[in-house]
């Protein structure tokens, strides 16, 4: 999930672990069992190239503008709520699978020249953001 923001931060265990000041992207990354490095790289590139910002020549991407990205893992994106009142997380990949793929997303963005801040994988996090628009989009790379 991608959000266009005017600033965002993530705290874990009462510590600020990632922050972007001003315009940029908040990328909430969920990983499922069938995801791999290829999907992680495509997600990073698609997010950074998505034209969500106004520029002098029309709509431009975070990559065009050199904007920062806050990457936060979020297994709850794969919640299954079809039965009952209690979500299940069976579709979310386990930590040993998901953590390196979230790192691939961040590394791919850095390779593109983005300033990347991250959350702390597996921690209870508090994410604060100013959603601009609001623009919130579910990205799918399959």
Locate each region found by the language model:
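N-terminal, polar/charged subdomain of small-to-medium soluble alpha/beta proteins
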Residues: 1-84, 100-142
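A charged helix-plus-loop insertion that forms the helical arch/lid used to bind
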Residues: 83-94
């Amino acid at each position: 999930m991608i959000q266009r923001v005017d600033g965002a931060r993530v705290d874990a265990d009462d510590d600020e672990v990632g922050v972007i000041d001003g315009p940029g992207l908040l990328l909430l990354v969920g990983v499922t069992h069938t995801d791999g490095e290829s999907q992680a790289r495509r997600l990073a590139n698609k997010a950074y190239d998505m034209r969500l910002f106004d520029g002098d020549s029309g709509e431009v991407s975070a990559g065009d503008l050199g904007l920062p990205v806050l990457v936060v893992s979020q297994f709850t994106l794969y919640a299954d709520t079809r039965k009952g009142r209690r979500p299940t997380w069976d579709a979310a990949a386990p930590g040993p699978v998901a953590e390196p793929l979230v790192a691939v997303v961040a590394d791919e963005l850095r390779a593109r020249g983005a300033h990347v801040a991250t959350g702390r994988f597996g921690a209870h996090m508090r994410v604060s953001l100013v959603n601009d628009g609001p623009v919130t989009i579910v990205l799918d790379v399959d």
